[in-house]
């Protein structure tokens, strides 16, 4: 089963389905900047904003990650895990965070370098076209019990997500 997104008007096939509101987040094993495995369980008891992007080295991905970081400054983020997951190596993620003005303290960058299973399970693995093998752009928000409260598969990879809906879902899940 696959979805379609587009890039500059060209249709691109994406494997699977993004987790829908009301469903449980799929488990994952990803890699942090220190090359340590991280699982969904490492973020238990926190609300989660999972932002999946093609590459942190693109302007839209970089700018939108910074925007989420800024928006989280307005939230009580001690109980929030903001995970940004590009299809990049941990070294690129660390370099991007280090070069940012404030170091992006609200974001935990994770990499799929050891497996693309995360991208399949979260319905974002691009199957066709020149970007095959990396991820589409998506946002998934879940509560402390890993129940999805909001998800968006951005229909055009070159566009930004709906920040306001994601943040509203994140803050509403605290109540």
Predicted regions and their residues:
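Chalcogenol-based redox active-site neighborhoods
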Residues: 1-175
């Amino acid at each position: 089963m696959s979805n379609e997104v587009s890039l500059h008007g060209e249709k691109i096939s994406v494997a699977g389905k993004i987790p829908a509101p009301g469903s449980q987040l799929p488990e994952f094993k990803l890699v942090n900047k220190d090359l340590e495995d991280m699982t969904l369980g490492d973020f238990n008891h926190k609300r989660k904003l999972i932002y999946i992007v093609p590459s942190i080295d693109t302007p839209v991905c970089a700018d939108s990650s910074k925007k989420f970081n800024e928006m989280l400054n307005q939230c009580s983020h001690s109980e929030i895990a903001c995970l940004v997951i590009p299809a990049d190596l941990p070294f690129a993620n660390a370099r991007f965070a280090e070069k940012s003005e404030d170091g992006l303290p609200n974001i935990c960058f994770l990499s799929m370098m050891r497996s693309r299973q995360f991208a399949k399970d979260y319905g974002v693995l691009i199957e066709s076209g020149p970007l095959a093998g990396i991820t589409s752009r998506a946002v998934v928000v879940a509560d402390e019990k890993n129940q999805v409260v909001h998800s968006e598969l951005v229909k055009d990879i070159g566009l930004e997500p709906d920040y306001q809906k994601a943040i509203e879902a994140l803050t509403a899940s605290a109540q």
